[in-house]
């Protein structure tokens, strides 16, 4: 008699993906972030669904409906804090997941890597629209400034912005359509994540050594299911500590003031997870140039498979490339800090140097380091 998980059409799919899946025997904790991102997505969809039951996407009542959720709905304050901090946690896991992919050379799986970049863009779009819903000062002005960047596109820019706004400024129509998109996008992300997994299971997982592991594989269950479960427990412990003790740590206190189109905040900035890209945007004095640099700051990830010059896949035994990668991480942290500062000296020049260094490391220094390391191995 065949085991049900190997014969039932639905169970068979789950079995191939999560139970009998052959996995490298040496993958470390850095490979946990895929499952943690899945957990974050589930938290966001469930908490978002409950928030949508009480939220009204209308400029007159949006702010008071969020207040109503926090004050009158049973555990509404908890659901709202979970959703707001869940977004931050999502991006923390996402950036660590991308960092691991760069460090261990996982970008050589082209389809998996490119579907991951599409997932990143979708998640960023969802996060941006979610920021608008409380209809606080930073919601309104952040939406105005960021959407207005599209007006830099030649010829169609102004029409495009007015089409997105649904009028001549960010208003009720904008909030309504953002709510519709924000509701549907997580389900598109979930579908895209399944495509991402499909591509990954075509090739199998990479490992810290960056070498083929076909000769030494173990079943995913129970080894990596247990490992993933431990990661989830640790993640949830960190998450609920943040939600219950310091829910506004990563938020913007300006958003506790209702949106006022007549009063511009002294410093308009997006959420912390977009600050590095925002700093790159601001470092270029030209509007169109800034928008191009903003898009390229994420799209440059797609070039990694094409600018790989080293014979070794992983950075584990490549000290020069390791140094450059950690230099890039430091640079992104500096850009994140700069993005949250006002546009005045010395922040302007620091942002410009950090932006130049970001592209220089990825496009020039890392490929050169790879070629040098090839020569060093031959010695």
UniProtKB/Swiss-Prot annotation:
Keywords: Electron transport, Heme, Iron, Membrane, Metal-binding, Mitochondrion, Mitochondrion inner membrane, Respiratory chain, Transmembrane, Transmembrane helix, Transport, Ubiquinone
Residues that hold a ubiquinone according to the record: 201
InterPro entries cross-referenced by the UniProt entry: Cyt_b/b6_C, Cyt_b/b6_C_sf, Cyt_b/b6_N, Cytb/b6-like_sf, Cytochrome_b, Cytochrome_b_C_euk/bac, Cytochrome_b_N_euk/bac, Di-haem_cyt_TM
Binding site for heme b b566: 97, 196
Cofactor binding note: Binds 2 heme b groups non-covalently.
BP GO terms, sorted: mitochondrial electron transport, ubiquinol to cytochrome c
Residue stretches spanning the membrane: 33-53, 77-98, 113-133, 178-198, 226-246, 288-308, 320-340, 347-367
Compartment(s): Mitochondrion inner membrane
Cofactor(s) named in the record: heme b
Entry GO terms, CC: mitochondrial inner membrane; respiratory chain complex III
Annotated residues for binding of heme b b562: 83, 182
Membrane topology, as annotated: Multi-pass membrane protein
MF terms (GO), sorted A to Z: metal ion binding; ubiquinol-cytochrome-c reductase activity
Subunit structure: The cytochrome bc1 complex contains 11 subunits: 3 respiratory subunits (MT-CYB, CYC1 and UQCRFS1), 2 core proteins (UQCRC1 and UQCRC2) and 6 low-molecular weight proteins (UQCRH/QCR6, UQCRB/QCR7, UQCRQ/QCR8, UQCR10/QCR9, UQCR11/QCR10 and a cleavage product of UQCRFS1). This cytochrome bc1 complex then forms a dimer.
General function of this protein: Component of the ubiquinol-cytochrome c reductase complex (complex III or cytochrome b-c1 complex) that is part of the mitochondrial respiratory chain. The b-c1 complex mediates electron transfer from ubiquinol to cytochrome c. Contributes to the generation of a proton gradient across the mitochondrial membrane that is then used for ATP synthesis.
Additional remark text: Heme 1 (or BL or b562) is low-potential and absorbs at about 562 nm, and heme 2 (or BH or b566) is high-potential and absorbs at about 566 nm.
Family, as annotated: Belongs to the cytochrome b family.
Stated name of the protein: Cytochrome b
The organism of origin for this protein: Microdipodops megacephalus
């Amino acid at each position: 008699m065949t085991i049900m998980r190997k014969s039932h059409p639905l169970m068979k799919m789950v079995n191939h993906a999560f139970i009998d899946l052959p996995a490298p025997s040496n993958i470390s904790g850095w490979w946990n972030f895929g499952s943690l991102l899945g957990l974050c997505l589930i938290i966001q969809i469930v908490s978002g669904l409950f928030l949508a039951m009480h939220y009204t996407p209308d400029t007159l009542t949006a702010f008071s409906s969020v207040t109503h959720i926090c004050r009158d709905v049973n555990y509404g304050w908890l659901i709202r804090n979970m959703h707001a901090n869940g977004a931050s946690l999502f991006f923390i896991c996402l950036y660590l997941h991308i960092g691991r992919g760069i460090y261990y050379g996982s970008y050589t799986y082209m389809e998996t890597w490119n579907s991951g970049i599409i997932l990143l863009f979708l998640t960023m779009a969802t996060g941006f629209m979610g920021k608008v819903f409380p209809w606080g000062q930073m919601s309104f002005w952040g939406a105005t400034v960021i959407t207005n960047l599209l007006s830099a596109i030649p010829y169609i820019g102004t029409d495009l912005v007015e089409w997105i706004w649904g009028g001549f400024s960010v208003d009720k129509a904008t909030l309504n359509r953002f709510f519709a998109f924000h509701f549907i996008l997580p389900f598109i992300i979930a579908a895209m994540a399944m495509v991402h997994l499909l591509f990954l299971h075509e090739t199998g997982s990479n490992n810290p050594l960056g070498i083929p592991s076909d000769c030494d594989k173990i079943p995913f269950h129970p080894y990596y299911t247990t490992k993933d479960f431990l990661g989830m427990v640790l993640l949830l412990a960190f998450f609920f500590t943040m939600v219950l003790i310091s829910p506004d740590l990563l938020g913007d206190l300006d958003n506790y003031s209702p949106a006022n189109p007549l009063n511009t905040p002294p410093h308009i900035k997006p959420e912390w997870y977009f600050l590095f890209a925002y700093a790159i945007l601001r470092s270029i004095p030209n509007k169109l140039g800034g928008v191009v640099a903003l898009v390229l700051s994420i799209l440059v990830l797609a070039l990694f498979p094409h600018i790989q010059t080293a014979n070794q896949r992983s950075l584990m035994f490549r000290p020069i490339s390791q140094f450059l990668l950690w230099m890039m991480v430091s640079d992104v942290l500096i850009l994140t800090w700069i993005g949250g500062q006002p546009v005045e000296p010395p922040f302007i020049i620091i942002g410009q140097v950090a932006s130049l260094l970001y592209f220089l490391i990825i496009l020039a220094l890392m490929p050169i380091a790879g070629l040098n390391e090839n020569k060093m191995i031959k010695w």
